[in-house]
């Protein structure tokens, strides 16, 4: 059996190990493999992390069975810290610029609303998807799924009066039928 076939049979995770002292060199700079600010809330469940958008997100909780997780979200409430990567698009031509990147017409996208969006190549191939927030005129946040989209923004921003940046925020989800009580 070839070595790459053996590698494909394995699941690779990042395990949290108590560290006393300075940050390990392998994890520097801190922008790489960064963890959600609320990750400490996951520690009692002995999480195993995977990289998603160059951010650590829990893939498996060793102290909670998959059945317990399923029923918690179906009958109760859960807080899930996700790896979606928010990108801020701002400026007088933010909506016009978004029409070049995404498939849905921004003129139909009301202020204060969210919209499921697809970023596509010129030939129609999908790059990634995510949830767009229309915060105010000239200000959009795209919480994108895993995939490299930032360079695509930069490549298409020329000629538009827009600013594309990482707003340095994280996404969390509160899910389940009892979520409105939290």
Task: Show which residues each predicted segment covers.
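Acidic, proline/glycine-enriched N-terminal capping motif
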Residues: 2-120, 125
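Short amphipathic alpha-helical segments, especially helix-boundary/capping motifs
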Residues: 71-75, 127-130, 156-159
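Long, hydrophobic/aromatic-enriched structural stretches that serve as scaffold segments
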Residues: 123-128, 135
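Acidic, low-complexity central loop/insert segments
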Residues: 131-182
């Amino acid at each position: 059996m070839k070595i790459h076939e053996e590698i494909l049979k394995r699941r690779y995770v990042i395990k949290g190990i108590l560290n006393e002292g300075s940050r390990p060199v392998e994890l520097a700079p801190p922008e790489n493999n960064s963890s959600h600010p609320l990750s400490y809330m996951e520690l009692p469940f002995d999480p195993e992390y995977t990289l998603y958008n160059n951010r650590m997100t829990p893939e498996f909780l060793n102290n909670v069975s998959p059945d317990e997780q399923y029923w918690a979200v179906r009958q109760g409430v859960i807080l899930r810290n996700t790896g979606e990567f928010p990108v801020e698009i701002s400026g007088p031509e933010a909506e016009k610029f978004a029409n070049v990147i995404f498939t849905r017409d921004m003129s139909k996208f009301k202020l204060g609303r969210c919209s499921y969006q697809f970023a596509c190549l010129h030939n129609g191939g999908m790059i990634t998807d995510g949830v767009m927030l229309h915060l105010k005129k000239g200000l959009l946040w795209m919480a994108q799924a895993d995939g490299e989209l930032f360079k695509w923004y930069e490549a298409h921003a020329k000629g538009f009066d827009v600013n594309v940046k990482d707003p340095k925020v994280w996404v969390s989800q509160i899910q389940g039928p009892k979520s409105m009580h939290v």
